[in-house]
């Protein structure tokens, strides 16, 4: 790329991504920037431009990028091996620490993504209750599974509880097992819960919707709904 400006180099990488990645991105949310490195709460793109990182990997970078202690621990473990498909002492100790720190976590199942966590949670709720339907709030994002990719964008059609798939390829049978409720509308939520109380296995909820935080009064009013199997 000799002779190219920083802007040209960045655009060339974006163009390459569009040829080899669906949508030109690793996920479903594209940004016209290619990150080169990160340190603490800041990242730099391929042109050297600096940004304050409010995303932090969508959650996992709790102590920021390239934290010295995290880097040192990761390098030490890489030298000993990374994936064993078996129990290991450090993983068990981490699970023990989580159980001690989280009052409602009696046991821990480690997964690689929020999508997997939601899938396991829905499966556990269905197994425990022997019911199939899950209540989800319109506009809430809970990963990329068929069950979660429903009614991500609030449409305010008033046609609750019908689920609207947000991707092609989602079977109708999956849609029929999801009940969609409006965010921050206690009256409608209560009505849906009463109507489907004998079918509901649980509800999937977040601390906030896609565009706003959950009002405390709404959270309190939902406390009597079916067991919340995912609260992220």
Give the location of each predicted region.
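Active-site-adjacent loop/helix segments that line or gate small-molecule/cofactor pockets in enzymes
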Residues: 2-39
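Active-site and channel-lining beta-strand-loop segments
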Residues: 33-53
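Hydrophobic "anchor" residues on beta-strands that sit immediately upstream
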Residues: 49, 202, 231-232
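Glycine-rich loop-to-alpha-helix module at the N-terminal edge of alpha/beta enzyme cores
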Residues: 50-132
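Short beta-strands and strand-loop turn motifs
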Residues: 52-55, 202-207
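Residue-level signal for inorganic ion chemistry
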Residues: 74, 178, 203
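PLP-dependent aspartate aminotransferase-fold enzymes
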Residues: 96-199
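Active-site core of PLP-dependent enzymes with the aminotransferase class I/II
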Residues: 185-192, 205-231
């Amino acid at each position: 790329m000799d002779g190219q400006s920083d802007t040209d180099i960045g655009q060339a990488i974006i163009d390459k991504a569009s040829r080899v990645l669906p949508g030109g991105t690793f996920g479903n949310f594209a940004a016209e920037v290619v990150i080169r490195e990160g340190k603490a709460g800041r990242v730099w793109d391929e042109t050297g431009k600096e940004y304050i990182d409010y995303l932090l990997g969508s959650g996992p970078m709790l102590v920021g990028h390239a934290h010295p202690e995290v880097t040192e621990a990761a390098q030490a473990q890489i030298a000993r091996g990374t994936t064993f498909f078996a129990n290991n002492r450090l993983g068990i100790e981490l699970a023990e620490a989580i159980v001690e720190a989280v009052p409602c976590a009696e046991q821990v199942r480690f997964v690689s993504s929020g999508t997997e966590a939601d899938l396991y949670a829905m499966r556990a709720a269905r197994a425990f209750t022997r019911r199939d339907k899950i209540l989800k709030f319109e506009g809430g994002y809970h990963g990329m599974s068929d069950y979660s990719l429903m009614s991500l964008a609030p449409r305010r059609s008033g046609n609750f509880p019908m689920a609207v798939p947000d991707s092609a390829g989602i079977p109708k049978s999956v849609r029929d097992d999801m009940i969609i409720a409006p965010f921050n509308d206690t009256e409608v939520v209560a009505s849906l819960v009463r109507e489907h109380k004998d079918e509901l296995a649980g509800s999937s909820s977040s601390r906030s919707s896609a565009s706003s935080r959950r009002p405390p009064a709404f959270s309190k009013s939902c406390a009597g709904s079916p067991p919340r199997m995912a609260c992220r």
